[in-house]
């Protein structure tokens, strides 16, 4: 699949400059926090963006104990983010009732997921663990003008931190019920003072299952019978270069490996074929397929941001993402070999985006060109 998109947005600002300055002064006097977002492909004050957007900062996420992107729905109204059937890392996303309930590979979802403005084309592997994040932006409503065909419901933007230039090292551990053990390590090292920085992050997230597979087909032999368990490893490396105050370059690599078991469904009625009763727990299931599951996601991106003048800035983003999923979906939830789908999803895509932002005293322009090629 290859697609090319061009987008231009312009706005005339007719309000008197004095009035705008006066409003700004009033806000400063009231002590309102200035929250910057990039919902319209340019840095703006959240209070002044004419888009329905929720911005959740890293401090807010940490204070609320949020570790995965599905929990962001607590902060954003009219937003549903859930792990889908089959795997723990396949995302079902709805905003204002628009989305894709069945996360079929090969179909464009109704809500776009972006990592530093790089589009994640498939729902497989889109349940992102929050590692080295600066903020999450949730844009509600159609965003097709600036984000393309896949955002009729909205868009969710995962924005990672830019490095401060100081040596930093952070270790975070979380322990919980069902033997939950989460470890995250993040840090940054200046390679050349005030110019070149290396950032890194690594996470290991493990948890026993909420339920179990009560019966597994006998011909499969010994199987791990935990259902809804978690075994995820995520890594990120970033190289940032600032040769001048006007030029910024970033090379970033990220990887996610999900070895959690396949997620078994819950029976609402007893089986007519096996007489299997309805499980006591909604997390218990039956299956005739192997319980192992593997999801691998890798991404590489390059960003160049150049401030030409006080009024004009240019940005170029090139990216390549690869995904591979080997999972098993048992639709009938019995130990019989019927309605079973051993699924393998394998995809790769590349994208190139060029953005231009111009802002004068009473005129703003956002223009861009986008090329996407996926298979």
Range-by-range predicted roles:
Residues 139, 167-170, 215-223, 281-288, ...:
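Extracytoplasmic loops and strand-loop junctions of Gram-negative outer membrane beta-barrel proteins
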Residues 248, 253-297, 329, 337-345, ...:
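Flexible loop and strand-edge segments within Gram-negative outer membrane beta-barrel domains
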Residues 1-27:
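Cleavable N-terminal targeting peptides that direct proteins into the secretory/outer-membrane pathway or into
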Residues 122-123, 147, 173-174, 224-226, ...:
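Outer-membrane beta-barrel domain signature
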Residues 168-170, 175-207, 211-263, 298, ...:
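Transmembrane beta-barrel wall of Gram-negative outer-membrane proteins
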Residues 25-166:
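Acidic, small-polar-rich N-terminal luminal/periplasmic segments of exported/outer-membrane proteins
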Residues 126, 211-218, 262-268, 327-335:
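Outer-membrane beta-barrel translocator domains and adjoining extracellular loop/strand segments
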């Amino acid at each position: 699949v290859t697609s090319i998109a061009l987008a231009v947005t312009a706005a005339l600002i007719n309000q008197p400059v004095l009035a705008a300055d006066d409003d700004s002064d009033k806000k400063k006097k009231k002590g309102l926090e200035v929250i910057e977002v990039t919902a319209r492909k340019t840095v703006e004050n959240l209070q002044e963006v004419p888009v329905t957007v929720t911005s959740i900062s890293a401090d807010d996420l940490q204070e609320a104990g949020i570790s995965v992107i599905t929990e962001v729905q607590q902060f954003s109204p009219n937003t549903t983010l859930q792990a889908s059937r089959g795997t723990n890392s396949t995302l079902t996303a709805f905003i204002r009732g628009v989305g894709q309930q069945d996360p079929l590979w090969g179909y464009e979802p109704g809500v776009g997921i972006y990592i530093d403005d790089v589009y994640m084309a498939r729902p497989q592997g889109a349940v992102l663990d929050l590692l080295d994040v600066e903020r999450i932006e949730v844009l509600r409503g159609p965003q097709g003008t600036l984000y393309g065909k896949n955002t009729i419901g909205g868009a969710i933007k995962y924005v990672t931190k830019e490095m401060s230039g100081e040596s930093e090292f952070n270790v975070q551990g979380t322990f919980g019920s069902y033997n939950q053990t989460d470890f995250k390590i993040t840090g940054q090292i200046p390679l050349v003072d005030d110019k070149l920085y290396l950032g890194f992050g690594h996470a290991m997230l493990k948890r026993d299952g909420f339920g179990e597979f009560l019966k597994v087909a006998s011909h499969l032999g010994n199987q791990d019978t935990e259902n809804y368990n978690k075994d995820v490893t995520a890594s990120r490396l970033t190289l940032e270069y600032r040769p001048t105050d006007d030029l910024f370059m970033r090379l970033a690599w990220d990887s996610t490996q999900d070895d959690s078991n396949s997620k078994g469904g819950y029976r609402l009625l007893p089986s007519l074929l096996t007489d299997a009763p309805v499980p006591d727990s909604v997390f218990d299931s039956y299956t005739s397929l192997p319980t192992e599951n593997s999801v691998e996601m890798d991404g590489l991106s390059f960003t160049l941001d150049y401030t030409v003048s006080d009024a004009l800035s240019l940005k170029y983003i090139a990216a390549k993402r690869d995904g591979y999923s080997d999972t098993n979906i048992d639709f009938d939830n019995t130990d019989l070999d019927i309605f079973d789908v051993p699924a393998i999803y394998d995809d790769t895509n590349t994208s190139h985006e060029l953005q231009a932002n111009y802002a004068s005293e009473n005129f703003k322009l956002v223009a861009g060109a986008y090329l996407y090629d996926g298979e």
